[in-house]
């Protein structure tokens, strides 16, 4: 088969389309013939040499894909050759074939195109696990989403609205904010022109956000805590603004607030399987019912993954960038 390889870390040109051995599914795995993969910022970090695959994972980038089951490994039941699936991966999505543990497989939701389904697993699992399983967002609460026009952001808006929350977003410029509004965002904040703390407090009559989903890390840490409501929950899932910051813990104590930081890729298989099962139970019906949908910015050939990385790094996209095999 062919896959995108990274012989040496570097810029987008470091991604090389090359012939590699076919993966062989192990116990409890299936072999998926990839229809499409989605580009994530984690893939960019891996290409740059900053985010290596966990032990035992495929060396090729790609944390989510869609396709058809081509073969079953030993001990697999409940799935059949030919089933259309999408999958949460530890790596290997940028390839014509990938071996996937069955606990990380999902059926393609009703009404979703096979290729578009590649836009779902990583973002849905990230949002559901952080916003709902960890931060316990409830109906009537306010959710602040940083990077509202990103793949994560566009999914967080939809899921927040689906459960009855008020959703605030930050994004860069009126065009991206307009797309967020189309998805249901209630409070639109242009981070280039406005202070998100002031805007959130103004929109909530001084209460603040009950849950904040943050991709920036250190750069926003102190301001995020100021924007939190009493008993608020800050979920840090990215470090685009740096990994080291200072925080007055007294502010957390006063608000009885919580800060969590999680990643998905390196979690044990059992934890990933639990998240995937929760997503299938709670989110898949929302997608099948048309209340939540994948948001796809553009689709490129898998062999042109470098262009997909350029788009992500330029932050010109809204939603997901897909690579089709």
Language model segments and positions:
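Short glycine-centered segments of the SAM/dcSAM-binding site in methyltransferase folds
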Residues: 84, 142, 166, 232-233, ...
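Short amphipathic alpha-helix with an adjacent loop that forms part of the alpha/beta core around
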Residues: 196-206
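C-terminal capping/lid region of NAD(P)-dependent oxidoreductase domains
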Residues: 4, 289-298, 306-325
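Mid-domain Rossmann-like dinucleotide-binding core that forms the NAD(H)/NADP(H) cofactor-binding site
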Residues: 118-193
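Glycine-rich beta-strand-centered segment in the early N-terminal region that forms part
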Residues: 21-38, 50-92
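Glycine-rich phosphate-binding loop and adjacent beta-alpha segment
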Residues: 171, 219-291, 324-325
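NAD(P)H dinucleotide-binding glycine-rich loop of Rossmann-like/cofactor-binding domains
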Residues: 45, 78, 84-149
